[in-house]
Amino acid sequence: MVKSFQGVRMAEPKKAPIPQILVKEYMSTNLITFKPDDTIDQVMEVFSKRKISGAPVVDASGALIGIISEVDCLKEIIKGKYTNTPKFPGKVSEHMTTDVITLSPDLSIFDAASQFLEHKIRRFPVMKDGRLLGQISLSDIIRAFPTLRQTTW
């Protein structure tokens, strides 16, 4: 009795998973933060010296409560023009954004890039288990580009 011969079969090569490039690989972890009682004067001085455009606002326990940006500071500058104030005594708590969107450190850079496009903002705090781990900016995503070009998508 002869059994049918099916011939030589090649084993299908397993496709290697596409390596994920994650937010945690490109986020900044050495953050400059502000307190709600800091003045806009103080914020603008730090922004200018450190060449940054925004930073997280944290409470006494280090919990994220908002974001302060150059745009937020403009509100105080404009107010100062009308009151003829050379200093900007307004508090961070009066101008910060409190409805903060955060990203996970385990989110892919591609998904993070989509969030930048969707929300039209320049930075996201990175949080895990309610703890502020860092921040990722639009320029961090751009910095990841050479690595992104080497992946197959």
Language-model segments: residues:
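Tandem CBS (Cystathionine beta-synthase) repeat/Bateman regulatory domains
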Residues: M1-W153
